[in-house]
Structures are given as C-alpha cells and as structure tokens.
Amino acid sequence: MQYFEDIPIGQKQAFGSYQVTREEVLAFATKFDPQSFHLDDEAAAKTHFGRVSASGWHTCAMTMAMLVENMKGRKQAGLGSPGVDELRWLKPVFPGDTLRCETEVFEKRRSASRPEMGIFKSRAKVFNQHDEPVLSTTSIGLVAVRDQNAEITG
C-alpha cells in the first residue's frame, strides 16, 4: 500500500493507454454535452474541429479512468480529492486517438485538521498518439498517512 509518506515531491509517472472510440464519443456527448460538433459529422466539418471531437468533459473522464487504473495498480491509499486548481483543453480529442498520461507531484503537506490524511498537488498532462498534449490539469489529492500519530511534517 502506498501512503502519504511514500509519495516524494518530484515523483513522475507515465501510464495509460486509452483508445477513444466513435461510439463512446457519441454516447458521452448525447448524454452529457449534446453540441453538434460532438455528434454530427456534417456540422463538425464546418467548425474549427473539422470533424466530430470528444467533449472536453469526456476527455476529463478518460483521464480520470487512466489515473484511477494507475492508482489501483500501485495500491495507493487514496481518499479522494477536494478538487482541481486548473484545467486546460489544449487540443481536440478525436475518435481513433490513443491517449496516455504523465503526472508529477510538486507539493505535499499533512493536514493539520485531519491527522490521518495527507494532501498532495500534482500536474497531469494527457497526450495523443502523436505526443501532442491534449489536456493539462493541476489537481489536489488526499491520501492516508501510515501513522496518524507521527509528527506533522511535510
């Protein structure tokens, strides 16, 4: 199990391989972001996207799927997240793309009010199969500490 104490500042990881399918793009857009450029080839061709593209929120969901799969593989003692500080959609994601993720932890601290919990911040970048960045985010993670009675330092 990976606890707060096991996560060093500067830790970098590269992981994931998410195949974006047309069916999934259309299903997500139909339910959550039914704009024509996510659903209709003809309408999308007339936009700056040029063709049907995934919703940015769908790209976030695909990113989350890769992050959680990586966390499960490392058996991280994750306790959720209070949110995201920054989110940027850098390039459209299209059916047929293959996504991967890179992360780096840049800050961490023990919670003063919840001694059983550590807080860390990380940057994530998602790339397509051409190594073009399509999404970047700065997020906050909560993770269990190994010994909540230990002195609260970093």
Across the structure, where does each feature detected by a protein language model lie?
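HotDog/MaoC-like acyl-thioester-processing domains
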Residues: 2-9, 92-154
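Mid-chain, well-packed structural core segment of small domains
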Residues: 73-97, 101
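Hot-dog-fold acyl-thioester-processing enzymes
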Residues: 1-83, 148-154
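Generic structural detector for well-ordered beta-strands
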Residues: 14-19, 88, 140-142
